[in-house]
Amino acid sequence: MSAFEIEHLASCITAHAWNADRSRVALCPNNNEVHIYAKQGTSWVVEHVLAEHDQLVTSIDWAPKTNRILTSSQDRNAYVWTFKDGQWKPVLVLLRINRAATHVKWSPQENKFAVATGAKLVCICFFEEEHDWWASNHIKKHKSTVLKVDWHPNNLLLATSSSDYKVRVFDAYIKKADGRSVTRPYGEVAFGEPVFEFDQCASWVHALKWSPSGSTLAYSSHDGVFAVANFSTNPPTIEKLRVRNLPLRDLLYITENSIAGVGYDCAPLLITNQNGWKYSGEMDKASEGGAAAGSETSARKLFQNKVDLGESKSADKKLTTVHQNCITSIVPFKSVGGVVSDFSTSGLDGNIVVWHVKALEAKNKFKVI
């Protein structure tokens, strides 16, 4: 079995998301549109084009239970798309922001969602039945652009990463969405007040992700710092690791003790918990049939060659990795009980790659734990 399957669907992909049965994928080809591809035989063909946004689409999330697509854009808007009568119908979300929407995420129960923004705030959005629209409450404790958001499995806590170098955890309880009978993990915290705030990074915090159990929160920043906050203690303990690779743009828990990271190195890397979090190597050391990777990462080698040799001697050389440019997102493709057996990545090279974890383990001699 091949370690990966690759599809070239655009000249550049900035975000992608799958539907529940993985028969369709929604992606942004680096413009104001979202293209929905469907598998027909051995080929992927464009089935729908969502073109309501005016500027670059920054994020896509496809709810598996309700089959609703959530999109955000630099045009300061977010839309909830519902499939009806053979067409995707958009509903504008009332965000009330004056800067770009940077990232969106449905809550686990899909009764609300979070929108990160460049307006130094996060919108917690919920559906108001009496008005038939998606309204929002604002969390305003950030000092700069919010880059990523991620929901805790309990549907109440929300983690945010920001360009003010901090990671924050908020109680995002909304009475109209969550009801009155829920048990809030940290008591009656006022909406918008951070429960925890972490400042171990010295640069933009690009990515963060909760573990499947919600007991740990991993995040990474532009200065090469990777950290994990362990919430089994109170206050949480922080374990920090500085990876030698280029900065990570996105993270994914493969298991509770194994995390895949992607970014400017053009290859997924693995970090595992072996009595402490440690860098375990690249999951894509070289493409099948390609030259073996050296001691340096492929992306760093390419840029160094450009400096040493000039553009004409390196510009037309292919990287030894599957992706040929920065990887912008990583999402689970197949998972059972919090264990991911397959995951997909998309990048600025226009490729979507589905990776098979067991085949990667056999090929590259590493172990997911």
Curated annotation (Swiss-Prot):
This protein's UniProt keywords: Actin-binding, Cell projection, Cytoplasm, Cytoskeleton, Repeat, WD repeat
Gene3D superfamilies recorded: YVTN repeat-like/Quinoprotein amine dehydrogenase
InterPro entries membership: ARPC1, WD40/YVTN_repeat-like_dom_sf, WD40_repeat_dom_sf, WD40_rpt
Per-repeat ranges for WD: 8-47, 52-91, 141-180, 200-239, 322-365
Chief place of localization: cytoplasm
An MF annotation (GO) of this entry: actin filament binding
CC annotations in GO: Arp2/3 protein complex; cell cortex; cell leading edge; cell projection; clathrin-coated pit; cortical actin cytoskeleton; cytosol; extracellular matrix
Pfam families per the UniProt record, alphabetical: WD40
Source domain of life: Eukaryota
Subcellular location: Cytoplasm, Cytoskeleton; Cell projection; Cytoplasm, Cytosol; Cytoplasm, Cell cortex
Gene Ontology terms: biological process: actin filament polymerization; actin nucleation; Arp2/3 complex-mediated actin nucleation; exocytosis; phagocytosis
Role of this protein: Functions as a component of the Arp2/3 complex which is involved in regulation of actin polymerization and together with an activating nucleation-promoting factor (NPF) mediates the formation of branched actin networks. Seems to contact the pointed end of the daughter actin filament. The Arp2/3 complex is involved in organizing the actin system in cell motility and chemotaxis, in phagocytosis and macropinocytosis, at late steps of endosome processing, and in mitosis.
Assigned protein family: Belongs to the WD repeat ARPC1 family.
Subunit structure of this chain's protein: Component of the Arp2/3 complex composed of arpB/Arp2, arpC/Arp3, arcA/p41-arc, arcB/p34-arc, arcC/p21-arc, arcD/p20-arc and arcE/p16-arc. Interacts with carmil (via the region between the LRR domain and COOH-terminal proline-rich domain); carmil is required for Arp2/3-dependent actin nucleation. Arp2/3 complex, MyoB, MyoC, and the alpha and beta subunits of capping protein all form a larger complex with carmil.
Protein name from the UniProt record: Actin-related protein 2/3 complex subunit 1
Recorded name of the encoding gene: arcA
